[in-house]
Regions:
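Hydrophobic alpha-helical segments, chiefly the membrane-spanning helices
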Residues: 1-366
Length: 366
């Protein structure tokens, strides 16, 4: 490392931990309040606490990702997102009428927010700035090959069954299939086909990579410890804020699916912003690795974990989407296959994905 690089090394200060700690104190003292202004204030503070720690999780995971390189970097970020999601879902599973459909709604929202909103917005911005962007076609195809059957099996196939849902045995089998599929994917991503997930013309210089920021002066162990601390902070605030959140959503008469949309938006916002920065730096391969890696890891790992939690706690899970949601999700996945079929994208690809994202929003708020 050059002297110039040494000079810009930064020491991370974990002052953002103040927000989740403050939120926990307020939730402990006034979390049972039913007064609407108090409930709104508590939820806003909890939101700030969750987002501050979620951004810190991604920040520390990003440093570790930068040191390990691709594809391990994207893998760390994807797994961090899954841990955040499982903690949010498990915290909310025991409360509210939305509990049986919460995992389904969250998975559907994550698929659509990523494949419609984030991918569309990224390709639109990147296309406006660079006209045409390039990526490793074969790497994107690996994500889609694994993602398409999992999404269909978990969210579409149950509607064709006699009870329009999985039995307990079928749900456990689907959980096993999901985990096994991810295991196979990890094998090709980290062992046999690593080169598929790197575009050779990216990362020529780390100095100009805004996705990673300045080099850190801390050790990898230091970043790993703080990553875990912030994950615990997110889990703690989420669990204590579950009841105030349900109270707020009930008072707003929010649609049942809105809770899943909210959970998905919370966990994707930090990583989504980082990926958008990568696209604007013409590193679209890294951004797509993050986007599709998060979706694939979310389905593959959330389904087994939440299914086991539901099985052990006696909670019911509803898997099948409604007809409008099925149409929009399948259309978005097919569009991904079309958009990335040549390894080149432009603003038209982005506009098409955003059109389907608008259709997704209609299914939530219709």
């Amino acid at each position: 490392m050059s002297n110039a690089q040494e000079a810009v090394k930064t020491r991370h200060k974990e002052t953002t931990l103040i927000f989740p700690v403050l939120a926990l104190v307020v939730l402990f003292l006034w979390g049972s309040s039913q007064t609407l202004p108090v409930v709104i204030a508590i939820n806003l503070l909890a939101l700030i606490g969750i987002l501050s720690s979620a951004f810190s999780v991604v920040r520390h995971a990003d440093v570790l990702a930068h040191r390990l390189g691709e594809p391990y970097g994207s893998l760390i970020l994807s797994l961090s997102v899954v841990i955040l999601e499982v903690s949010l879902i498990s915290a909310l599973m025991a409360t509210g009428d939305a509990a049986p459909t919460l995992m389904r709604d969250t998975l559907y929202s994550i698929i659509m927010i990523v494949t419609g909103g984030l991918v569309g917005f990224s390709l639109l911005l990147g296309g406006r700035k660079f006209a045409t962007q390039y990526m490793n076609l074969f790497g994107i195809k690996q994500y889609l090959i694994a993602l398409f059957p999992l999404a269909i099996i978990v969210l579409v196939f149950p509607m064709a069954l006699p009870a329009a849902n999985f039995s307990t045995g079928q749900a456990l089998l689907v959980a096993l299939i999901s985990a096994a599929m991810y295991g196979v994917f990890l094998l090709i991503q980290t062992k046999t086909h690593q080169s598929l997930f790197v575009y050779e013309h990216e990362d020529d210089s780390d100095d100009d990579d805004p996705h990673h920021g300045k080099p850190s002066a801390h050790s990898s162990v230091w970043h790993a410890i703080w990553l875990i601390i912030h994950l615990i902070a997110v889990i703690a605030v989420t669990k204590m804020n579950a009841s105030p959140l349900e109270t707020l959503l009930d008072s707003m008469n929010a649609p049942v699916a809105f809770t899943g949309f909210l959970v998905a938006l919370l966990i994707l916002s930090p990583e989504g912003l980082g990926a958008l920065k990568a696209v604007l730096n013409n590193q679209v391969q890294r951004a797509m690795n993050l986007f599709f890696g998060s979706v694939l890891a979310t389905i593959s790992l959330t389904v087994p974990v939440v299914t086991l939690i539901a099985f052990m706690t006696g909670n019911e899970l509803q898997f099948a989407l409604g007809a409008p949601e099925m149409v929009v999700m399948v259309a978005s996945l097919v569009l991904c296959h079309i958009s990335f079929s040549t390894g080149r994208t432009n603003v038209l690809n982005g506009a098409a994905h955003l059109a389907l994202f608008a259709a997704y929003l209609m299914t939530i708020f219709a």
